């Protein structure tokens, strides 16, 4: 039997966070771990073709192999373009400073 590692799969919403802990075989992919965790059944809005994933805040591919205990994070899509928001804030601040 292959060695197993303990991992967490985390998905955060604005008002709550789901954290699932499980043991998987060493060398399993991030995608395998997510599917095995059952989080997709709890959160049907997660689409692995759309949602980005990461390990401790660093984006990784679904095919990344897991060799040590870790935390897999599933990220929600951005609601707005960060560059556009910064541009709008700068424009608003400029207008307010002219008053």
From Swiss-Prot:
InterPro entries assigned to the protein according to its UniProt record, in alphabetical order: Mopterin_synth/thiamin_S_b, RnfH, RnfH_sf
Family, similarity comment: Belongs to the UPF0125 (RnfH) family.
NCBIfam families on file: PRK01777.1
Protein name: Protein RnfH
Gene: rnfH
